[in-house]
Amino acid sequence: MKENAASRVVFILLLFLSVSLLNGQSPPEKPKLVKCRSPGKETFTCWWEPGADGGLPTNYTLTYHKEGETLIHECPDYKTGGPNSCYFSKKHTSIWKMYVITVNAINQMGISSSDPLYVHVTYIVEPEPPANLTLELKHPEDRKPYLWIKWSPPTMTDVKSGWFIIQYEIRLKPEKATDWETHFTLKQTQLKIFNLYPGQKYLVQIRCKPDHGYWSEWSPESSIQIPNDFPVKDTSMWIFVAILSAVICLIMVWAVALKGYSMVTCILPPVPGPKIKGFDVHLLEKGKSEELLRALESQDFPPTSDCEDLLMEFIEVDDCEDQQLMPRPSKEHTEQGVKPMHLDLDSDSGRGSCDSPSLLSEKCDEPQAHPSKFHTPEGPEKLENPETNLTCLQAPQSTSVEGKIPYFLANGPKSSTWPFPQPPSLYSPRYSYHNIADVCELALGMAGTTATSLDQTDQHALKASKTIETGREGKATKQRESEGCSSKPDQDTVWPRPQDKTPLISAKPLEYVEIHKVSQDGVLALFPKQNEKFGAPEASKEYSKVSRVTDSNILVLVPDPQAQNLTLLEEPAKKAPPALP
């Protein structure tokens, strides 16, 4: 019996449910919370939107609980905020707590709940619009007229205590315009508007926003009529500035046109060109560098090279002990075609290039149309072929015994530079000359001494002939002289007579030469310097002119008359030095 009663109850319920569904009744839809706003962080109000009620009367309730609590509370006031709202008074508002709010819809068919909304009172502040909006036209005597807008802060917002920082936005426009002109202010409750159009009616609205929260609603529109005689802009100053600028521009254009200058030249002057004396820009543009350098050299600039550079350009002349003591290659080796071994010469001294057999043979093969002449210091002449003489600085020396006049071979074979071995008694004292001036003075002294010794005794003539001759037969010597490798002096060459009391060879060693001066043409003037000075100081001659090159690798220099004249003018007169032997 009991089982039958239970089945009957279930059947009846299903019947009623089906009937209600056929009539359109159902549980309510889920409501939606719209927003919660607080006008001043002391109270707040929440609003929701109800869903479909399901054809039945539906009751809505708002429940909440604070973060960290389990106790659920219902809305304290459903009437203050209006329909579908809940108002939280100061008693139920806490600024330091997070609220979890839910809306429930209930009818006979069931219950529906909205999604929870998390609310913090500090971030939901939306103040009321500013109150007491006032518009007024001001006409001050010392300034332009303007529109003065004034308002009051929202009534429910405590601004005086500093609890809020309110920002205001004002917008205005002519009545018939569509775009608003906006202005922003901070903490101020008044604003001045200039540059209004006369005869227009302006509409003004204002709203506010706290530092953390939302903009309030716009206040109701306020309007004001601008009179027709309202000045718009004071353009007199701008007109004066424009006229003054135009006058200045006209004066500048007139000045430029009068002087014939272009505007670009006046504004951007050209870069000044080089102002070097004698510098021609056209030569540089045409690529004529030689003429340009010649023009620069013509100025009073100091010489670009010093004495060291000039000395490096000349060939070093010295007398090597090894060369003098080297034995002459035997006749047997010469006949067998074996060449004598040469010493390893210093490539930097200049002797290596002049001792080269190939270079000497090439120089000796060239015929000399006019052999070099050896003159006295009183009448030196210019070398006719200086390049050949300078190249063969190491050529041997020969002396004519028959005529008792010394002559010098400018070009000779390399094998003639090795003298015969002589006994120690026949060796003359060695000289410690190390430069051109010592060699020249020694050569001049030897020339005079040879002539004197030949006149006195035949024995000295025999020794001189043995020293100078190359060891070959007289026919070979004459043949070499006929081919142009020897240079003889002219018959009219006047030789100075040696002094009667001049010694044969001075045993006093000569030290390194002294550089007297370097002329502007690059001529190097030298004179010897001795270790010991006997007697009064002696004046030395300047040997700066090359006369010829002897066969014994001696460069013969003679005094330059022009250089001596200049020396006499520049320096005080000194006692003439004795003639070197």
From Swiss-Prot:
Q: Which SMART domains match?
A: FN3
Q: Which UniProt keywords apply?
A: Disulfide bond, Glycoprotein, Membrane, Metal-binding, Receptor, Repeat, Signal, Transmembrane, Transmembrane helix, Zinc
Transmembrane regions: 238-258
The residue ranges flagged as biased composition, category Basic and acidic residues, are 329-349, 375-384, 469-483
User: In what tissue types does this protein appear?
Assistant: Expressed in all tissues examined; liver, peripheral blood lymphocytes, endometrium, corpus luteum, intestine, fetal thymus, fetal spleen, fetal liver and fetal brain.
Q: Which domain of life is it from?
A: Eukaryota
Instruction: State the residue spans of region: Disordered.
Output: 324-384, 458-499
Which Gene Ontology MF annotations are present?
A: cytokine binding; metal ion binding; peptide hormone binding; prolactin receptor activity
**Gene Ontology BP, a term:** positive regulation of cell population proliferation
User: Where found in the cell?
Assistant: Membrane
Q: Where is the Fibronectin type-III domain?
A: 27-127, 129-229
Q: Which Gene3D superfamilies does the UniProt record give?
A: Immunoglobulins (2.60.40.10)
> Where can the motif Box 1 motif be found?
267-275
The UniProt annotation puts motif WSXWS motif at 215-219
| Residues binding Zn(2+), per UniProt | 211-212
Which Cys-Cys disulfides exist here? 36-46, 75-86
Q: Which GO terms describe its cellular component?
A: external side of plasma membrane; plasma membrane; receptor complex
Parts of the chain on the Cytoplasmic side: 259-581
Entry-linked Pfam families: EpoR_lig-bind, fn3
Sugar-bearing residue positions: 59, 132
Q: Which InterPro entries match?
A: FN3_dom, FN3_sf, Growth/epo_recpt_lig-bind, Ig-like_fold, Long_hematopoietin_rcpt_CS, Type-I_Cytokine_Rcpt
Indicate the family of this protein.
Belongs to the type I cytokine receptor family. Type 1 subfamily.
Recorded hits in PANTHER family, A to Z, give: CYTOKINE RECEPTOR (PTHR23036), PROLACTIN RECEPTOR (PTHR23036:SF86)
> What is the protein's name according to its record?
Prolactin receptor
Q: Organism, per UniProt?
A: Bos taurus
